[in-house]
């Protein structure tokens, strides 16, 4: 996929879900969804939140999720569709976002597309000291794209740390 957000003439996660929802629900109009954020091509989202404006009971929402999930390709899954308050917005109502970045110092062919492989030893004590410094800053303009509609690049980092992963040599960086 070329990331999350719908783009002309290229497969995206959002576009794939929208087509599936439209087809399965037999909607006369294309169904549009709004994601809480975006991912770039090659980035995996394990828990992307999105919203869609539909008037469904909880039972109808679960039936739509089940049927749509069966139609989606193997690499996209809908975990739930739940009714929320009318003015809820996946992007603008979010109060925090957590990102996790995975790396390994050992070869693992099963995780090759989900982890960055490092070919040298890392000092995680020093990396955690550096990560903690992120919480002292609020202006992240240096990490932002230029010439966008974003009004501010200020945010509050509440946690930033490295921890060992599920297997020897695997590490996870978490930032909220």
What are the residue ranges of the model-derived segments?
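Structured-RNA-binding interfaces characteristic of tRNA pseudouridine synthases
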Residues: 1-176
């Amino acid at each position: 996929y070329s990331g999350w957000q719908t783009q002309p003439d290229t497969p995206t996660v959002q576009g794939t879900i929208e087509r599936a929802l439209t087809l399965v629900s037999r909607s006369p109009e294309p169904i549009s969804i709004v994601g809480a954020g975006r991912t770039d091509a090659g980035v995996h989202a394990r828990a992307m939140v999105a919203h869609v404006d539909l008037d469904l009971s909880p039972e109808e929402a679960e039936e739509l999720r089940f049927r749509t999930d069966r139609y989606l390709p193997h690499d996209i899954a809908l975990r739930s569709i739940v009714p929320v308050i009318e003015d809820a917005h996946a992007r603008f109502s979010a109060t925090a976002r957590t990102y996790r970045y995975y790396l390994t110092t050992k070869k693992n062919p099963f995780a090759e597309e989900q982890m960055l492989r490092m070919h040298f030893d890392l000092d995680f004590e020093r990396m955690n000291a550096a990560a903690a410094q992120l919480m002292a800053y609020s202006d992240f303009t240096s990490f932002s794209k230029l010439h966008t509609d974003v009004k501010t690049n200020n945010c509050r980092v509440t946690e930033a740390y490295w921890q060992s992963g599920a297997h020897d040599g695997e590490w996870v960086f978490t930032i909220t």
